[in-house]
Amino acid sequence: MNRLQLLSKGLRLIHKMSEEALAGVPLVHISPEGIFKYVMINVIDGGDASKAVIRGFADCTWHADIFEREEDVFKKLGLRAECPGGGRIEHNPDKKYLKVYGYSQGFGKADHAQTKRILATKYPDYTIEISDEGY
């Protein structure tokens, strides 16, 4: 094999690894209960593939705290991350209820309808409401 063929083979291997890393990223990771900030994150592999995921943690004061924590995780997997927006989530597991609302002062408002669709993949038996009201 010449150098170009070796390089091409290596790049294909790296691309396959990043596709597998992207496929392994969970769509939803949020706190088990309470009211907390959340961000939508577009996770991007080394090529053109990407997916939107939802992250929200009660122990994070700012939307940026959530994004930075998760961005570090994605970087270790060889993935890039972008944040198109955020908001808040109210999670009541006893009532099987989620409410998505508000916005992030730093990132803007996430697409709450898309957030609802993503949350429904993990919580199909929940009532999920969205609202553009509140902060």
Swiss-Prot record:
Q: Where are the transmembrane segments?
A: none
Pfam families registered for this protein in UniProt = Ocnus
- Please list the GO biological process terms of this entry: cell differentiation; sex differentiation
An example Gene Ontology molecular-function term:
protein histidine phosphatase activity
The question of whether rRNA processing is a record keyword is answered with no
Keyword match Manganese: no
Q: Which Gene3D superfamilies match?
A: Janus/Ocnus
Residues annotated as binding substrate: 37, 104-106
**Which keywords fit this entry according to its UniProt record?**
Differentiation, Sexual differentiation
InterPro entries xref list: Janus, Janus_sf
The terms describing its cellular component in GO are: cytosol
Q: What are the catalytic residues?
A: 63
The family line of this record is: Belongs to the janus family.
Function text = JanA and janB regulate somatic sex differentiation.
* PANTHER family, alphabetized: BCDNA.GH02250-RELATED, JANUS-A/JANUS-B
Q: What is this protein called?
A: Sex-regulated protein janus-A
User: Which species?
Assistant: Drosophila mauritiana (Fruit fly)
